[in-house]
Amino acid sequence: MVKAYLKFVQDKVFGLISTSNSILDGSGKLAITGCGERISIWDLRKQVLNQSLYEEDIKAEVTNVCLSKDGALLASGYSDGSIRIWSMSDYQLQAVFNGHRGSVTTMTFNRLGNILVSGSKDTEVIVWDIITESGLFRLRGHRDQITSVKLLERSNHLITSSKDGFIKIWDTETQHCIQTIVGHRNPIWGIDVNPDETRLCSCTSDNQIRFWRIPSNERQREDGSGIEPKFIVNTPINSAVIIPDEINEDGSKKENSNNSNNNDIDDLEIISEEEFAKYYGSITVKAESVSGVRFDPTNKILAVQSTGKFVDLFKITHYDTMKLEEISIVEEMRHRQTIKTSSKVRFFSFGNDIKHWNKFVITLAGNSLEAYEIKEKEQGGGAFEVSSTLDQAGHRSDIRSLSLSSNDQMLVSTSSESVKVWNMKSLSCIRSIACDYGLCTVFAPGNLHVIVGTKTGTIEVFELASAARVASIKAHEGSVWSLVLTPDLRGVTSGGADKLVKFWDFELIASQENSKHKVLNLSLTKTLKVESDVLALKYSADNKFLAVSLLDNTVKIFYTDTVKFHLSLYGHKLPVMCLDISDDSTLIITGSADKNIKIWGLDYGDCHKSFFAHDDSIMQVSFIPSTHHFISASKDKRIKYWDADKFEHIQTIEAHHGEVWSLAMGSVGDFFISGSHDRSIRIFNQTETPIFVESDRQREMEQTWEATLEDDTRMRTKEMLEENAAAGKQTLETIMAGEDILDAIELCVQEKFKIDEYEKLLKTTKNQDEIPLYQPNIIMLGLSPSEYLWNRINRIRPSDLEEALRVLPFSVMRTLFEYFNLWVDQSGKSVEFIFKCSFFLIQTHQNQLSVSTEFIPILQHLNTSIKNRLQKERFTLGFNRSALSFVKREIEINQQYKFFDSDLYLNKNNKNNKDKDSNNNKKDNKKDNKKDNEKSLKRNRK
């Protein structure tokens, strides 16, 4: 029988504050940001985590978050190209979209929140329908990562920017590019459009912010059709291109410019005969390089984010519209003030709500957030203040070492700037102490002190009660790479880059501040000189041996009592970064930078097994107490579970998004903790769920195969070179969903055949008592074939439906269309769903259907039935809409305020403060409205 092991699963994640962009909610009190594969919602006032949104099976990192304008929906983009929609009312997952083949870099909602536009590293833009949970279309044209997308809803246009240096303006109705703005010499890091949709600004890797005029409402056609139509012209490559540096401020091209010979411009598909956006001018900022621009919701402030520690605020001056053409952009955008942050600015965002326009949040590169509020002064100008700072819940840099207390109640972690102590129950940081670059750490016996070895060669002792450094000892000339407690708990042993192993005993000395107070200190007892730098140390549990890993790729075994040489373990091609000894002192495992793990016998030093374990350097190995199972961690971001007796790989854990530097094993072995370059600390618990090695290998093979389904390196077909395309993407889930439909169709065909045969038998047999009762297929759960197939198709996620139907072969199309005819005649079935499926299948198999005569009557009947059903649905919707309009007018008449007007509705108790003129005209207006309502009601009845 195959041996089953118990599975380790990730339980909790902490230490992360922000790894993606951050946004404010409508109230301005909550900050929403990505933390690894989770979305964290922080309470800015209390500085605590309010909510965490995630799915158990998500492994990809959150790369972008976006909130709808009304704050009802939250979209999160991931590094695997997927997008998830969450409800902000109950924090539940609403929809999942799969369409991108690279990380999602930017997203935006429309004003109603029913359309989402996303851009990705795969150079493509996809427009999604939130209501139907499906993709509308895909836009291609950029040659590098999409950096920003903006919707112009008043004119049905979409603006995109990319690292290829181009800004493209798309017509969302024709799904084609109508203008390409070129001339940026560097990648475009961001664009933004003001709330009035009259200004477009862009930023790149220089100190210039460039602006373009967008036609305003006054310049749009009076018939309400939006911007005047422009013909889309496929201009040859050598055609003239409008470049910002060669344009006059009035939008005309300079006479001496000759863009057709510009070497920076190639392979462009341009532009309409008349440009939609016209160059306006540019302003200069103090920073050498700019990485982001943002308008506030009220169009009062333009914020410019630099690549350093600065955010510049520009005040937008609003002039009379008649003089708009006469002013320059420098006069319109006036520098107001500069905000300097504590570390490098990573992202910047205003809130969506106009009421809180003066609040914004800055995501810093050091795993922290800062919330600001702009304060208006009485005499012009303005000031700002930091309203909240989130930095205590995580480290600013990599987590280099972890150590658990003896009772597993506390955890200590070190990084380049501090030592943090965590409560393992609440996962809150209870102590944060400034420290040099900590490379290793241990708890002193009693769990009242923490000992840290630093990169500068000192050993520092911290008292947890006072959160103070009580001792700092210059132990080594180089970095202290390893620090371990002696098995008798009387001292510690350190190994450093100065080729020395030093043995220290604990002692209590009088405090310098208070002579009566005793503090912990270390006294040197002996020193061991070795041939090379010491990288790792480990005592055997029986206190007989000390294993020392050296920079010369070997491991030396010494006797603990006499410090005499015992064995030398050699065979690694690169230095041994970590090692561990089993509790029974029989096995020693070594992990090296050569990506191999070796299992040795501690008695004779023989190598039991050597195997290629990871794809990068192995940083930590640790035995599970009282077993020969061990955990390894590597710079390839993976953690692996092994059996040292059978030399078997049991489980691979892919949880971190950066190099895994450290491990801490629980005292019983039922859990372990890992720390990583991504600044996260993760707890993995051992469950009662058995894991079978062979089944786990099969699952890994499926994941590898899925990764090849949409490979960016594959040949680009003619369809992929078109500007617009379908939004779906083939995944393992869509293939399995298509196979599920195919299995259901085959089962329904077999069951239908059995039912027909049974009915024939009933008709031909005189004595029906001799015929046994029909036994339906138990898999169908007592449903008819039609109902069973309907349920199976409806179970598929709407965003995966089209790709699942694409898997079906043409041989089952006749059966499927016959069921469509059956369903469309039933009132309980959704005609929209039937139409969507049938229309997609007809488009997919158009060539075969056009030459097949057997489908003609089926499709004709389906066409007629769908038209009739849609006509009925249209009549029902029209009647309901008219009835709702009538009810709405009645409410407005009776309650004296407009329906859905939140401000008037909330202030309905202040009706007596209204103008006297409106009260005098109330009766006349009511009579006129009643007459209009009666006329509309008669019209609707007809």
From Swiss-Prot:
Segments traversing the membrane: none
Cell location: Nucleus, Nucleolus
Any one of the GO CC terms: small-subunit processome
Residue spans of biased composition, Basic and acidic residues class: 912-942
Pfam families, per database record: Beta-prop_WDR3_1st, Beta-prop_WDR3_2nd, Utp12
SUPFAM superfamilies assigned: Quinoprotein alcohol dehydrogenase-like, Soluble quinoprotein glucose dehydrogenase
UniProt keyword list: Nucleus, Repeat, WD repeat
Chief location category: nucleus
GO function terms (MF aspect): snoRNA binding
Region (Disordered): 909-942
WD repeats: 9-52, 57-96, 99-138, 141-180, 183-222, 285-324, 394-432, 434-472, 475-514, 529-568, 571-612, 613-652, 655-694
Name of the protein described by the UniProt record: WD repeat-containing protein 3 homolog
Gene of this entry: wdr3
